[in-house]
Amino acid sequence: MQIIEIREPEQADFKQEQQIAVGIDFGTTNSLIAIAANRKVKVIKSIDDKELIPTTIDFTSNNFTIGNNKGLRSIKRLFGKTLKEILNTPALFSLVKDYLDVNSSELKLNFANKQLRVPEIAAEIFIYLKNQAEEQLKTNLTKAVITVPAHFNDAARGEVMLAAKIAGFEVLRLIAEPTAAAYAYGLNNNQKGCYLVYDLGGGTFDVSILNIQEGIFQVIATNGDNMLGGNDIDVVITQYLCNKFDLPNSIDTLQLAKKAKETLTYKDSFNNDNVSINKQTLEQLILPLVERTINIAQECLEQAGNPNIDGVILVGGATRTPLIKDELYKAFKIDILSDIDPDKAVVWGAALQAENLIAPHTNSLLIDVAPLSLGMELYGGIVEKIIMHNTPIPISVVKEFTTYVDNQTGIQFHILQGEREMAADCRSLARFELKGLPPMKAGYIRAEVTFSIDADGILSVSAYEKISNTSHAIEVKPNHGIDKTEIDIMLENAYKNAKIDYTTRLLQEAVIEAEALIFSIERAIAELTTLLSESEISIINSLLDNIKEAVHARDWILINNSIKEFKSKIKKSMDTKFNIIINDLLKGKNINQIK
């Protein structure tokens, strides 16, 4: 496939009167802001002439200082996290231990003489980027497309949007980083192809399989690790230097490790005073990390159905490491594409998408996917999957549910995320209740539940009860994040326990059907005794006792067989009119509808 490289112009022609939106890559290590006009991209430089602005924030002399490599680092890793997760994750705790307010019930940091939430602190970085761009463009900026890791969940995405909003931005769209990178490559709209985007940033790793056809950039599958990136390579090298040369585990040693890593991308050895490390040693140190990324990429390819890929697109500064290119080629035997500066590919894509949203000039369309299945808890703890893993978004799905017991005046909805069959094994996202329903017999209420994921990956759930005209809607904003380790565990457990889960679900469904049948028939007998003789009532009770014994035995096959026996014998021996009533009850009709 022909690749069209988007080259940055020395001086793009941005007219003051035209509407402008920026693209922002809020990175773990570095952040960038760019604008596009007529498909020409310009990365905005900082006041000290840097395109890559370190994502660090310090507070000195009553002022925030951005990008001086001091103070709080890697704030991106904190988006969507709870205090409990921070305390239980050493890598995260080490980032914030000097700022953490452990007495708070939620995640707050002692910063700028205040207790601030993560979005409030991150907003200062967005403000800095905004100010730099406004100063150079001599215009106010209010609209932005912002990139996020493909595996950022609802909570993390919501906090990114909140931080940008605090900074004065209207977020036109959140776009997954691999998708933005593919867009930046400007794949020819008249060509077709399937690409693997390998995005190893400073603190996150994402991989996506994209199908590009006539301007449509469709994500088929996505995978990643929100706690793996180039910073982890730096840490491994730092540990080696500390152990080998008896150096302190300090910021200076970390900076030395980064310098060694960068030097060894184009040289065979690195020497600094009494410290030395060669390329072979470096590759031995980081090979386990690289192999982790390759495994994740292969999993993603399997999730996509193992399509033939036309190339691997490299994104992120860490991909300059020669070992990564070598291992990718070994694994996929396909061209490795790195035409665009890997540090800029994501922000270029965001800027191009921003331009296209405010002044459409191409027929391009970006379609992303949901990283995990979303569903709802039913009676008995069963999960009803409503939006499946890797479903293209935006999407809206409507399903109808009813009540299980008589005279319910409210329905509780429990929103879940995960691949398992039972609610206890999935992750709870949110709960809400539809109140004020008229008391009715079980099965009479009809509630329509709508799950909607927008283009930003934000989930909204609404419920509407037709008879009472009652409705309720929420935007799901869980107070916790979900990282790649948990996603992997969910998927692995779903695979390992698939048979157990399926059997558990079959049992629970059989029990629910049996209990509903027993309840309906016993009520029918009480209300329609004039239609039955004593012998017929005796036969019915005997058959119901068999069902009850099967339920007590917790044997789904026995339960199903006893239900079949009940239906068969009732059909053969009961009065025709009562038979019709029984059949209607078995179809879910209310007794008042059929009397």
Curated annotation (Swiss-Prot):
One of its GO terms (molecular function) is ATP binding. The keyword Chaperone applies. SUPFAM superfamilies: Actin-like ATPase domain (SSF53067), Heat shock protein 70kD (HSP70), C-terminal subdomain (SSF100934), Heat shock protein 70kD (HSP70), peptide-binding domain (SSF100920). PROSITE patterns: HSP70_2 (PS00329). It comes from the Bacteria. InterPro entries: ATPase_NBD, Heat_shock_70_CS, HSP70_C_sf, HSP70_peptide-bd_sf, Hsp_70_fam, ISC_FeS_clus_asmbl_HscA. NCBIfam families: PRK01433.1. Belongs to the heat shock protein 70 family. This is Chaperone protein HscA homolog. It comes from Rickettsia peacockii (strain Rustic). The lineage of its organism: Bacteria, Pseudomonadati, Pseudomonadota, Alphaproteobacteria, Rickettsiales.
